Amino acid sequence: MTLDLDASKKDEKLLITTIQQEYKILAEYKMIESEKLSGIYVIPSYENSLQWYGVFFGRQGFYAESVFRFSILLPDRFPDEKSLPSIIFQQDVMHPHVCPFTHTLDISHAFSEWRCGEDHLWQVLKYMQAIFFDPVDSIRGIETDKLKNAEAAELLMNNRQEYAARVQENIKESKAHIYDTPPTEDPHYIVFEKFQPDVHGPVLERIKAGRNKAEASQQANGGHATGLSWVKEGEFKPLSIE
């Protein structure tokens, strides 16, 4: 009987711990939503909240027009343990902070360890935005041998034409697979559909109408508009109201 009671208490404690963790992860997602990060879309997996799916849209600079899929893997005891989340791209991404072998983004230069209550996932995504917006600035003051991709760093500093060409190869390769069959049946996996005028046209027109209305409202009250987004075939640009 004593053993049964002990087992029951352990199960109850585990359940409470799991619920608390799920609540904290949901809070992280809500914070990301409230930040309205431009060009980055993420969502937790339906099956496992410790795994997230994401897509990065480059807007300018070397990575303009890029569409890179990535996953976020959270430590088992996130956010209470000091281990950092992992961001892993699904394809090659030429960048000094991205490992060419594992495709993992190194965030340790901004986050030495995870501080529960102080560090948040939206900050990690902001960091991702910043290093792709200005890769040169992202490596300033960092020794080359401390970077995940020393070759990328050397090209960035000494042969930017070649660096840009390598990045364009990555972008072309990524776009070539944007409509591939999802590698998982998880309903939260981010899927792109080719633009079909008869199906998506009416939706696009409603978006445009809403954008015009929102812009008029924004001019009137100085507020920020939000709304739906879509992607035109061949362009990969979110037609979002921002």
UniProtKB/Swiss-Prot annotation:
Gene: cbx
Organism of derivation: Drosophila ananassae (Fruit fly)
Protein name: Protein crossbronx
Pfam families, A to Z: UQ_con
CDD domains on file: UEV_AKTIP (cd23814)
Domain of life: Eukaryota
Similarity annotation: Belongs to the ubiquitin-conjugating enzyme family. FTS subfamily.
Residue ranges of domain UBC core in the record: 20-176
